[in-house]
Amino acid sequence: MQEYRLVLVTGPSGAGRTTAINALEDMGYEVIDNLPLSFVPRLIEGPSIGRPIALGLDVRNRDFNATALIELIDRLTQDPRVALEVLYVDCSASELIRRYNQTRRRHPLAPAETPAEGVEREIDLLAPVRVRADHLIDTSEMSPHDLKAELSRWFDRGAATRLAVSVQSFSYKRGVPRGVDMIFDCRFLKNPYWVESLRALDGREASVADYISSDPRFAPFFEKLRDLVLFLLPAQLEEGKAHLSLGFGCTGGQHRSVAVAELLGNALAEAGWPVSKRHRELERRAAAVLPTHQGEKA
């Protein structure tokens, strides 16, 4: 009988591991950060504390090394009393370097060198651990709020048990978002950008959505899109997925993709599915007018 639910949280410094640990604590986990690896087995020697445990482990641990951590994962996986999950909070090297340069912090593996050298060294060190993760989350384009919301869908046992859906709009000129399961190209729809009265608005405005909906191709497209997604969601849930991410792209990420993402998100919510909506380019545009210190990353 499994008595302990244990989540090991690791990943490169600056990726958002501390944010993840704090989020798990808010969900009711008993959190222990930077515990030496050799002490971890002692946690399961006594009686269960009755709630799940989250352990934060990274290169700052006194006895940390990838081989020892993998051996610990193997040992805990084989223990019939333990339900183990490994969460790896990841981030691209370029974004990690940007975060270090922005905060002017020294990297723990390169205190006397550039952040880039420390980041590269740590990514190489953690590579064997990364492939053992049960959950991999890339925070390169996430805010702390985004990360907490994603973890809540994965680990909060008090949250809805149905598959959660996220829809997001984006601009193809700025690249396809990371971690999207399905992408739909909305550039075939007529573009409100060329209507002077609509150009400065975005797809959340009724006038923009009405203009896009007036395209003869919109109604059959949206009907088929909605039916396809509603057909797929139960199948994805049966396969054990907890989350499905849908991306909608157009040229500028302001009108067509935003409108379609909004309309589909509303349709899925009306059908009873938990839905979150994000509009990447609109967020970037809003962030550009804020002071630099408010642009916090995970």
From Swiss-Prot:
GTP binds at residues 58-61. One of its GO terms (molecular function) is ATP binding. InterPro entries: P-loop_NTPase, RapZ-like, RapZ-like_N, RapZ_C. The keyword ATP-binding applies. The keyword NADP does not apply. ATP binds at residues 11-18. Keywords: ATP-binding, GTP-binding, Nucleotide-binding. Pfam families: PapZ_C (PF22740), RapZ-like_N (PF03668). SUPFAM superfamilies: P-loop containing nucleoside triphosphate hydrolases (SSF52540). Displays ATPase and GTPase activities. NCBIfam families: PRK05416.1. Belongs to the RapZ-like family. PANTHER family: RNASE ADAPTER PROTEIN RAPZ. This is Nucleotide-binding protein RSKD131_3085. The lineage of its organism: Bacteria, Pseudomonadati, Pseudomonadota, Alphaproteobacteria, Rhodobacterales.
